């Protein structure tokens, strides 16, 4: 019979207790109550943050948008076809973030910064939050350097400065995207990093823009963020913030950046769709109450940073599509009030063969004149007034039978000015040539 000594047993138990080292992992897990239309209702996620990433059983990722008493409203960032009612959902403890780095230049990525151009993986150096705070007042500097668009009508009468937000607004098929693409092409010699965000566009349109940029040698300093029309509403909603995060990476490194959101009307529609499905109370035009904040928190991220922070800048050119020229609709008025001016493209001018079809009368740049070059300011000072007077004279001259010599001379000069401001697509003009032309 084996002799069992009690002190040995107690020593063995003590050693095992002392050497016991197991990490306790607490998982915050919930249950799917309901799923459909890109939305899931989840019960049991008690310690979830607003905007936190959640992972479903089929590896689909969602964002927690609605935090209610008894459930969480989640928007899905994928088709979610394999998510079942009663399935489990795990909180990740992370807020949406994307990889960033110099390797993104010349690439086409989706709303989560994953490459979609078939050129292989991208080497990222760090990661940034998709939604980050805009720079404060102290960290900013006044707009003082120009952004040359290469379009004579804009550079002379509606100048844009680095760090400005200038809205491009107009009906469909009036050349809004062309103005933005020309501006990107013109940055070839300016050492400006460009980010083009396509929201809810056809894949063929995005492919054609990428081809144009490649042909003009502009893709090397450009990042294209594409969220196609067939992508879930969540990805269309998040795409502009992803683009802003990529541009911010370069801005905080002291570089000048230019970002184009094409277009924010589609982002607002995607957000409206998500909000209505989440049963948020609808407001004007069925948009939710915080649709102004949707765009203001995005556009406030554009800034000219102070010298202490490296003097980098992010210039934003948001695009808004109007219906039948109605700039007083809800989303257009919201974005007009957030931005530092707008370039209004008119369908009537476009159809009359005046391209770019910029209506100079109601287009304005509130801060850009401080950044305009002295030479341009000198030659283009009275250009806007002369064109306005010409438009008025032209309207009256249709009713007059005989005109005096001074009026005829003014009309002839106005017609010459109008012809001079016409410009073919994808052919920006250097600022020196513009000054000589005027």
UniProtKB/Swiss-Prot annotation:
The keyword Chloroplast applies. ATP binds at residues 170-177. It comes from the Eukaryota. GO terms for cellular component: chloroplast thylakoid membrane; proton-transporting ATP synthase complex. F-type ATPases have 2 components, CF(1) - the catalytic core - and CF(0) - the membrane proton channel. CF(1) has five subunits: alpha(3), beta(3), gamma(1), delta(1), epsilon(1). CF(0) has four main subunits: a, b, b' and c. Belongs to the ATPase alpha/beta chains family. This is ATP synthase subunit alpha, chloroplastic. It comes from Ochrosphaera neapolitana. The gene is atpA.
């Amino acid at each position: 019979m084996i002799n069992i000594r009690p002190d040995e047993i107690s020593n063995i138990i003590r050693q095992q207790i002392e050497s016991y080292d197991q990490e306790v992992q607490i998982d915050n897990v919930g249950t799917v109550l309901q799923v459909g239309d890109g939305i899931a209702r989840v019960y049991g996620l008690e310690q979830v943050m607003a905007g936190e990433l959640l992972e479903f059983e089929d590896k689909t990722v969602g964002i927690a948008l609605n935090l209610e008493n008894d459930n969480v409203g989640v928007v899905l960032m994928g088709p979610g076809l394999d998510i079942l009612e009663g399935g489990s959902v795990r909180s990740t403890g992370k807020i949406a973030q994307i990889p960033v780095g110099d390797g993104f230049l010349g690439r086409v990525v989706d709303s989560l910064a994953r490459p979609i151009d078939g050129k292989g993986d991208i080497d990222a150096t760090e990661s940034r939050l998709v939604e980050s705070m805009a720079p404060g007042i102290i960290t900013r500097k006044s707009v003082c350097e120009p952004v040359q668009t290469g379009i004579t009508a804009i550079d002379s009468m509606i100048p844009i400065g680095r760090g400005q937000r200038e809205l491009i607004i107009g009906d469909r098929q009036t050349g809004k995207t062309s103005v933005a693409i020309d501006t990107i092409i013109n940055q070839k010699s300016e050492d400006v990093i460009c980010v083009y965000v396509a929201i809810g566009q056809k894949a063929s349109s995005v492919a054609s823009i990428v081809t144009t940029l490649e042909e003009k040698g502009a893709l090397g300093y450009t990042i294209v963020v594409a969220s196609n029309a067939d992508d879930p509403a969540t990805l269309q909603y998040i795409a502009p913030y992803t683009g802003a995060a990529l541009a911010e990476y370069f801005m905080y490194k002291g570089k000048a950046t230019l970002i184009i959101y094409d277009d924010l009307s589609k982002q607002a529609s995607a957000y409206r769709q998500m909000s209505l499905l989440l049963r948020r109370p609808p407001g004007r035009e069925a948009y939710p109450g915080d649709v102004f904040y949707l765009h203001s928190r995005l556009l406030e991220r554009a800034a000219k940073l102070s010298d202490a922070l490296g003097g980098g800048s992010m210039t934003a050119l948001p695009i808004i599509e109007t219906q039948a020229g109605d700039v007083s609709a809800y989303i257009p008025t919201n974005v007009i009030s957030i931005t530092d001016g707008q370039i209004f493209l008119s369908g009537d001018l476009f159809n009359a063969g005046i391209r770019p079809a910029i209506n100079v009368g109601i287009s304005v740049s509130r801060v850009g004149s401080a950044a305009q070059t002295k030479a341009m300011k000198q030659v283009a000072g009275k250009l806007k007034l002369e064109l306005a007077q010409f438009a008025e004279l032209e309207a009256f001259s249709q009713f007059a039978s005989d005109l005096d010599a001074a009026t005829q001379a003014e009309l002839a000069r106005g017609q010459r000015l109008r012809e001079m401001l016409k410009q073919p697509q994808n052919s920006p003009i250097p600022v020196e040539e513009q000054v000589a032309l005027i």
